[in-house]
Amino acid sequence: MNLEKQLHEGLEAISGLSADVAHLSSRLLRYIELITKWNSTHNLTSVRNPESMITRHMLDSLVVLPHISGPNIVDVGSGAGLPGIPIALARPEWQVVMVESNQKKAVFMQQVVVELRLQNVSIRQERVEKIKPGNKVDTVISRAFSSLERFMRLSKHLCENNVDHCRFIAMKGAFPDMELMQLPPEFSVEQIIPVAVPGLRAKRHLVVMRCHSE
């Protein structure tokens, strides 16, 4: 199966995507090309072949869409731009802020923004605890960033302008029993949602959390 067909079929299998699959597919393939090109010298991701990137990066990022709210999204610890860039490509009406302290990864994401002409993405090369929220944030999301406790502790200020409605979503693999036990009472877990990534057998869970109003 060629890359275009693999990606197209994977996108069609995601419920609630509500995007132009052909257009989104072509943009995601260009993004994969950029990751592959930069990966040889910048070590952006341990996933090396484009076929695996489709499943483990693109589709894995997009299965969250039915479970997040816009229009203002913050992606914490974006790395090579995941999940924020696929989300921004699928939801051009949303604004996505990518937070990444690593310079080479932030520079790469900026190049992706230029190459794909992404007007709804901004890159912040800073530690998340230094970020000052501007607009009301609707969703703060992280993928392979840290433990739940650390994610919430470092990011909680991002929702201070919208504390009643803002949600934190951590993308996890297996059910994170130990991490859940370590969450302090100021944070509550609203849902733990098992998600299926097309073409991937590994377990995936979304942990939906919020801060309590003071």
From Swiss-Prot:
Pfam families: GidB. Keywords: Cytoplasm, Methyltransferase, rRNA processing, S-adenosyl-L-methionine, Transferase. S-adenosyl-L-methionine binds at residues 77, 82, 128-129, 143. One of its GO terms (molecular function) is rRNA (guanine-N7-)-methyltransferase activity. GO terms for cellular component: cytosol. InterPro entries: rRNA_ssu_MeTfrase_G (IPR003682), SAM-dependent_MTases_sf (IPR029063). Its EC number is 2.1.1.170. It catalyses: guanosine(527) in 16S rRNA + S-adenosyl-L-methionine = N(7)-methylguanosine(527) in 16S rRNA + S-adenosyl-L-homocysteine. The keyword Cell inner membrane does not apply. HAMAP family: 16SrRNA_methyltr_G (MF_00074). Belongs to the methyltransferase superfamily. RNA methyltransferase RsmG family. Specifically methylates the N7 position of guanine in position 527 of 16S rRNA. This is Ribosomal RNA small subunit methyltransferase G. It comes from Nitrosomonas eutropha (strain DSM 101675 / C91 / Nm57).
